[in-house]
Amino acid sequence: MIELFYASTPNGRKISIMLEETKIKYKITPINLNKDEQLKPEFLKINPYGKIPAIIDHEKNLVLIESGAILIYLAKKSNQFLPEKNEIKIFEWLMFQISNVGPILGQLHHFSHFNPGKSLYSEERFYKGALKVYAALNNQLKKNK
């Protein structure tokens, strides 16, 4: 059984969706970020960086952090979504999501909605970055129709 330490964030949802799709048995341990539960000593033993998601595979006594590593682990554990002939291209797009899509859209959301000082520079910078990300994704999707 997999234990998922979860909050309803994009990274948390990635893992819960993968668990549902793979039909791997799991249980959710909710982590309330608004109450700083990710910074409590018992959670820091699981992830010293105090971030979600994290999983424990109780069958293997394995703790994993970082959404990309967890997604790869779940794909390999379930023998799904990671065909050997396309593995490197799958990793390429996973890394694109981890290093571009997530951070840029996350920063755009943050600076557009939560920045108390309102920074037009930041909003415009991440908006332009988001346009580049969406253009790259659209171009790839067009190639694979």
Language-model features and meaning:
Residues 134-145:
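Hydrophobic alpha-helical bundle segments that form small-molecule/ligand-binding pockets
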Residues 1-125, 131:
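GST-like domain detector, emphasizing the conserved glutathione-binding G-site
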